[in-house]
From Swiss-Prot:
Keyword Transmembrane helix part of the UniProt annotation: no
Free-text function comment from the UniProt entry: Substrate-specific adapter of a BCR (BTB-CUL3-RBX1) E3 ubiquitin ligase complex that acts as a negative regulator of Wnt signaling pathway and ER-Golgi transport. The BCR(KLHL12) complex is involved in ER-Golgi transport by regulating the size of COPII coats, thereby playing a key role in collagen export, which is required for embryonic stem (ES) cells division. Negatively regulates the Wnt signaling pathway, possibly via the targeted ubiquitination and subsequent proteolysis of dvl2 and dvl3. Regulates convergent-extension movements during early embryonic development.
Keyword Nucleus: no
Protein name: Kelch-like protein 12
Top-rank taxon: Eukaryota
A GO cellular-component term linked to this record: COPII-coated ER to Golgi transport vesicle
Annotated compartments: Cytoplasmic vesicle, COPII-coated vesicle
Subunit structure: Component of the BCR(KLHL12) E3 ubiquitin ligase complex.
TM region positions: none
SMART domains: BACK (SM00875), BTB (SM00225), Kelch (SM00612)
Biological process terms in GO annotation: anterior/posterior pattern specification; convergent extension involved in axis elongation; COPII vesicle coating; endoplasmic reticulum to Golgi vesicle-mediated transport; neural crest cell development; neural crest formation; proteasome-mediated ubiquitin-dependent protein catabolic process; protein monoubiquitination
Length: 564
């Protein structure tokens, strides 16, 4: 029989446990580390094996080589105790309270495992309120992966980050670095302009001189004419600065003289790159007069369509949302019954992904509205085959569970659901007797629905999306005609206006925002199913047909996914 090496995972662990017991009983210890007057007995060989810092100290010709006591400066006794526990046990508890001391100490003593654990912990704690501070902390301690992760987080969540105290405390050069970045993800330049203005006003006396320089990096020509005239022109800080007025005039000229745009090209006239976003169109009612399971993906950069794996169950009247790199296909109608089942696609750019089932809703729902708020999915209304619902339920993907929430005032199917400023809006729909123009708003903090100003037109099967802090409602059916009209709701003024009509009437149409523009996807025009996609540019208040899918459909689920 040939000899064979046998390895056991428990051997190294048992040695560490024995060494730790010896340390705690001060047995065979040959070095004492003194920190803030507290002595920590230890074994040179263990310290040297875990730390390049101690290895150099005990094996080179440093003064500490022959000493039995070593003073360690630059960390606290409590931190030293945590680090020694790691050396002897290979475990460390990183907390919000200790990480700011633990990471610098781990860097000082060159304990790579603790440094990595601290970086992983801080990465998991990234939030709009702390990402800028974590980025600076990571840069100070040469944690390059964490620094990059924090930068990407601040770019992805720019609109939220600039509302935090950390942003207000940045230096002028740090603000400039952030707003000039091509990769910040914003639907328009409005939050960029407002971020600069708010930063200046936070300390106007000292910061006002920086305003013209910072506005150089705001892409004002890409703002809507209405925003330029109503907001920017009315701002006193802009009106009293000639360099700022010059930038505003450039933006106005860009709109008033479109024939000169080719001569005005500069970084200010180029859209930010942001993340690579793709549009998914899922299921629906197809040309065979039945529900379909086809999933198509549109890349706006290449203007090309491709197919993804089909959903497991054919569905029309389906609701779809994207959340944390996953796509959820919710409820619908399979041709026989309304569904409570939910399918999920875990999607990455280099893989097609696989559909799998998650927890079913508490209620069967077709033509329900769906949206996301925070890390939760909300679904409201819909038709179960016998009645329309007022109910709303929420899905928590962390525990794979649905829970019921407060009922709407009106039962609705075919209504749109969208989040704006932390509130959930439900718009239009059909109550079983009438097509509706009413709008309700849900406050997650109070759990109550309240009515707001209704739409000008009754609409069911309309597309709903949020663009530049305004809710757009496109197309739908009013009981008589299939609509091409578009209404816009200002959440600040509780007021509705109209913008340019779509090129084609569309009912059971999907709507979403992609790279700062509003897309209306497929639908039914009153005569035939559509495969065309049109796009609305709010800067010039105009729609254009940009592409067509391979599949004619209505009642489809649509969402935008950011590719990694």
């Amino acid at each position: 029989m040939a000899p064979k090496d046998i390895m056991t995972n428990s051997h190294a662990k048992s040695i560490l446990n024995a060494m730790n017991a010896l340390r705690k009983s001060n047995t065979l210890c040959d070095i004492t580390l003194r920190v803030e007057g507290t002595d920590f007995p230890a074994h040179r060989i263990v310290l040297a094996a875990c730390s390049d810092y101690f290895c150099a100290m005990f094996t080179s010709e440093l003064a500490e080589k022959g000493k039995s006591f070593v003073d360690i400066q630059g960390l606290t006794a409590s931190t030293m105790e945590i680090l020694l526990d790691f050396v002897y046990t290979e475990t460390v508890l990183v907390t919000v309270e200790n990480v700011q001391e633990l990471l610098p100490a781990a860097c000082l003593l060159q304990l790579k495992g603790v440094k990595r654990a601290c970086c992983d912990f801080l990465n998991s704690q990234l939030d709009p309120s702390n990402c800028l501070g974590i980025r600076d902390f990571a840069e100070t301690h040469n944690c390059l992966d964490l620094m990059q992760a924090a930068e990407l987080f601040s770019q992805k969540h720019f609109a939220e980050v600039v509302q935090q105290e950390e942003f207000m405390l940045l230096s002028q050069s740090e603000v400039e670095k952030l707003i000039k970045c091509d990769e910040i993800q914003v639907d328009s330049e409005e939050p960029v302009f407002e971020a600069v203005l708010n930063w200046v006003k936070h300390n106007r006396k000292e910061r006002e001189p920086y305003l013209p320089d910072l506005l150089e990096y705001v892409r004002m020509p890409l703002l809507t004419p209405r925003y330029i005239t109503d907001v920017i022109d009315a701002e006193p800080l802009i009106r009293c600065s000639l360099p700022c007025r010059d930038l505003v005039d450039e933006a106005k000229k860009f709109h008033l003289r479109p024939e000169l745009r080719s001569e005005m090209q500069s970084p200010r006239t180029q859209a930010r790159l942001g993340a690579k976003e793709v549009l998914l169109v899922i299921g629906g009612f197809g040309s065979q007069q039945s529900p379909i399971d086809i999933v198509e993906k549109y890349d706006p950069k290449t203007r090309e369509w491709s197919f993804l794996p089909n959903i497991a169950r054919k569905r029309r009247y389906v609701a779809t949302v994207a959340l944390n790199d996953r796509v959820y296909v919710i409820g619908g109608y399979d041709g026989r019954s309304r569904l409570s089942s939910v399918e999920c696609l875990d999607y990455t750019a280099d893989e097609d992904g696989v559909w799998y089932s998650v927890a079913t809703m508490n209620v069967r729902r077709g033509l329900a509205g769906a949206t996301t708020l925070g890390d939760m999915i909300y679904v409201a209304g819909g038709f179960d085959g016998s009645r329309r619902h007022t109910s709303m339920e929420r899905y928590d993907p962390n525990i794979d569970q649905w829970s019921m929430l407060g009922d709407m005032q009106t039962a609705r199917e075919g209504a749109g659901l969208v989040v704006a400023s932390g509130l959930i809006y439900c718009l239009g729909g059909y109550d079983g007797l009438n097509i509706l123009n009413s709008v309700e708003r849900y406050d997650p903090h109070t759990g109550h629905w309240t009515s707001v100003t209704p739409m000008a037109n009754k609409r069911s099967g309309a597309g709903v999306a949020l663009l530049n802090d305004h809710i757009y409602v496109v197309g739908g059916f009013d009981g008589t005609a299939h609509l091409s009209s578009v209404e816009v709701y200002n959440i600040r003024t509780d007021y509705w206006t109209t913008v340019a009509n779509m090129t084609t009437p569309r009912c059971y149409v999907g709507a979403t925002v992609l790279r700062g523009r509003l897309y209306a996807i497929a639908g039914y025009d009153g005569n035939s199913l559509l495969s065309s996609i049109e796009c609305y540019d709010p800067v010039i208040d105009s729609w254009e047909v940009v592409t067509s899918m391979a599949t004619q459909r209505c009642d489809a689920g649509v969402c935008v996914l950011r590719e990694k």
